[in-house]
């Protein structure tokens, strides 16, 4: 088996806390980079290094020797993104450009970016595919779209993969209850009943283990 040296941004967040134990279990060496606004729920491991840092200064970090960069850093969800648009653009776009440039200069082989299915906006089509036009509405999904474009401009220098997951749900050591499925599950467990507003709308979801 080929074991890789992997650098992960946003590593202590909702998705990273599920992904990193899987990478370690497969024998890879992982450096977890996170600002740790919500602490660190990663368990200690011989192949894990945890670095507290601001992704907006990622150009100061040495990426030489890494095979893959997985970019999960983000100001998560639409309301948070709109709360401080300047911070959202800095984290999702400026930092993304600095990270891509750093990775390229450091001869990183592959780049995986966690974008969002929300870049499509609100569609009337029953099924949303990659062929449909991107019509982002909020600061969150606008910055995701721009960040994709930044990474794709480096596709001639390294392998670039942009994934657009549906709303990620499921259990994580760094739990999020702003996600509808998680919130309804919590309500059901705590109150024995759930509250559904509307009831006619549809929303795509993906389990966190299927994404990681």
Residue ranges and their predicted role:
Residues 6-26:
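N-terminal Rossmann NAD(P)H-binding glycine-rich loop of SDR-like oxidoreductase domains
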Residues 12, 75-79, 117-126, 134, ...:
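Active-site segment of SDR-like NAD(P)-dependent oxidoreductases
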Residues 46-57:
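Rossmann-fold cofactor-recognition segment
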Residues 55-91:
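NAD(P)H-binding glycine-rich loop region in Rossmannoid oxidoreductase-like domains
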Residues 97-139:
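Conserved Rossmann-fold NAD(P)-dependent oxidoreductase catalytic core, especially the SDR/UDP-sugar
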Residues 143:
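Active-site helix of classical SDR
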Residues 149-203, 208-210:
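NAD(P)-dependent short-chain dehydrogenase/reductase
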């Amino acid at each position: 088996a080929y074991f890789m040296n992997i650098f992960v941004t946003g590593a202590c967040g909702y998705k990273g806390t599920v992904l990193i134990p899987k990478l370690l279990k497969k024998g890879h060496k992982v450096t977890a980079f996170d600002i740790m606004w919500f602490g660190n729920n990663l368990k200690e491991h011989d192949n894990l290094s945890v670095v507290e840092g601001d992704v907006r200064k990622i150009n100061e970090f040495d990426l030489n020797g890494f095979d893959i960069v997985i970019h999960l850093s983000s100001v998560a969800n639409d309301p948070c993104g709109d709360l401080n648009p300047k911070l959202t653009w800095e984290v999702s776009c400026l930092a993304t450009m600095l990270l891509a440039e750093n990775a390229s200069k450091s001869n990183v082989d592959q780049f995986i970016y966690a974008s969002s299915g929300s870049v499509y906006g609100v569609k009337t089509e029953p099924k949303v595919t990659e062929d449909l036009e991107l019509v982002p509405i909020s600061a969150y999904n606008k910055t995701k779209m721009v960040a994709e474009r930044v990474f794709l401009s480096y596709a001639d220098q390294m392998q670039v993969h942009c994934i657009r997951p549906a709303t990620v749900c499921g259990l994580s050591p760094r739990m999020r209850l702003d996600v509808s499925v998680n919130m309804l599950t919590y309500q059901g467990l705590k109150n024995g009943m759930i509250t559904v507003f509307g009831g006619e709308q549809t929303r795509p979801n993906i389990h966190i283990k299927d994404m990681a």
